[in-house]
Amino acid sequence: MYDRVADLSLEIESYDLEPLEHAVSPEFKRRTTVVRLRGEGHEGIGEDVTYSPEDQEGFQSEGHSVPLAGSHSLDSFSQLLDRLALWPAGPAIEQFRPYRRWAFESAALDLALRQAGAPLHEVIGLQPLPVTFVSSMRLGEPASIEPVKRWLDAFPKLRFKLDPTSTWDDALVTSLVETRAVDTLDLKGAYKGTPVDQEADPTLYARVAMAFPNVWIEDPALTEETDPVLEPHRARITWDAPIHSVSDIHGLPFPPRTLNFKPSRFGSVRALLDAYDYCGEQRIGIYGGGQNELGQGRSQIQYLASLFHPDMPNDVAPKAYNNADPAPGLPTSPLAPAPSKTGFRWGETS
C-alpha cells in the first residue's frame, strides 16, 4: 500500500512547532508538540506525542534546527529523516524515539496530500467507515470502580479498555464483570521504567483471564510463572508496546490473532502501511491505540481506524474522554466518518 503514497510530491518551504498542554488530572499535565510543515500555500500537521516534558521543551526550544526545506517525494523525505538528528540529545526513554519521527512523517503525508488536492482514503483506495471506540483508563491506587461508574452514569453504552494492577481484588473484578462494559485489559507487561509499569503477576493474570473470558488481554509479561496461566487464553492475547514493524510481529512468542497498532510507535508511514499490508495478508486483526494526543494527532488515528479497523475496540476516543470526569454532550461510539476534503485530517471541512 505504501507505493500508493510514496511518490506524492512534497514541497517544503518552512516549518513551525506549536506547544500544546492539557491538565488531564491534578497529578498529570500532558504536553505535546504540533509540527506544521508549510509549502505552496498549504500546511501539513503532525504531533509529537513523547511523554517526557523535558523532551518536549527541548524540542520546542530547538526551533527550526532541522533542515527540511526543498522539493521531495514523500519517500525521499522519509529517507532524508533517516539522515537527520531529530533527537540531538537523545530521548529520555528510547521508546520515545519514533514518536518524533511520526510527527514529521504524518505532517509530510498531510502536506503532500493537500498539495495534491486529495484525501488519504482516496489515494489508498479505502472507504472511511464509522469508528467504534472505547475509553481507556486506570482505576487508581488502590484501585476503585468509581471512575468506571462515573463514566457509565453519564454514558451507559460506553465501553472500556482498562489497566489491571496487582491491587485489583476479587470484589473489584466482580464489580467490573457486572458492568459488561470491558473489551480490553492492558497488562502493561512490556513497559520498563515508566509510571505505568506492572510486574508479571500470575495471580492477577489468572484472576482477570478467568473472570473476563471474552476480552482481549494485551501485553502480558510472559515468564515461567505467567505463561502457563495464560497459555489457555492465547487466542485472546494481543500486543501493543512491542510492535514497531513487521519484524516485531515475526518476533512475537507465538502467532497473534490480533494486534494493537499505535501509528506513532512505527515512526514512518512506510513501516505502518507495510504492517497493515502484512496483517491483511496473514488475517491478523487490528485495533487502534492512542497516546493521549492533544491535537490533530488524535483525529489522524481516528481516520486510520475508519479505514483499516472501524469495527474493533479502538482506543481512539475523542480527547475529552481522557479527562478524569465526563462532560455532557460528548460524541458517542461509533464516530461518523469525517475525513477532510484533502490531506490526512479528520473532522475538518477543508
Q: Where do the protein language model's features map onto the residues?
A:
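Metal- or metallocofactor-binding catalytic centers and their adjacent structured scaffolds
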Residues: 2, 38-39, 43-116
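Glycine-rich beta-alpha junction loops
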Residues: 39, 51, 292-294, 320
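Active-site-facing alpha/beta catalytic cores
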Residues: 96-222
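Catalytic core of soluble alpha/beta enzymes
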Residues: 168-305, 314-315, 322-331
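C-terminal extensions of enzymes
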Residues: 322-350
